[in-house]
Amino acid sequence: MARIAGIDLPRNKRIEIALTYIYGIGRSTSQKILAEAGVDANTRSDNLTESEVAKIRENIDKNVKVEGDLRRDISMNIKRLMDLGCYRGLRHRKGLPVHGQRTKTNARTRKGPARTVAGKKK
């Protein structure tokens, strides 16, 4: 089982799919990584040689921000917005949608379960 960026890749999947188990790597990024490393995308992850794993690992370390570093950057960006007090930061702080979605109805994912108000009728 190959271990890249602190993640154990699943054994029986194609390496193109297995790389997407790493936070910050999707399908297109995994295809680019494999093309630069010169590894066939259809190879199963348990059939990779040590040199291929080393090439992939080196390519990811050099070109892609993944896992902890990426999570830290995202949280620092959100914290920066909240410290600035800009509109997006206020929306993050209040736990409301940030990208202009409606909130009179819907937005339940961001707002949480509905809290009924006593005495409010149509």
UniProtKB/Swiss-Prot annotation:
Query: Which Pfam families does this UniProt record tie to the protein?
Result: Ribosomal_S13
State the protein's name: Small ribosomal subunit protein uS13
Q: Which GO terms describe its biological process?
A: translation
Keywords in alphabetical order, please: Ribonucleoprotein, Ribosomal protein, RNA-binding, rRNA-binding, tRNA-binding
Family label: Belongs to the universal ribosomal protein uS13 family.
Source species, domain of life: Bacteria
Q: What does this protein do?
A: Located at the top of the head of the 30S subunit, it contacts several helices of the 16S rRNA. In the 70S ribosome it contacts the 23S rRNA (bridge B1a) and protein L5 of the 50S subunit (bridge B1b), connecting the 2 subunits; these bridges are implicated in subunit movement. Contacts the tRNAs in the A and P-sites.
* Entry-linked HAMAP family: Ribosomal_uS13
The species this protein belongs to is: Geotalea daltonii (strain DSM 22248 / JCM 15807 / FRC-32) (Geobacter daltonii)
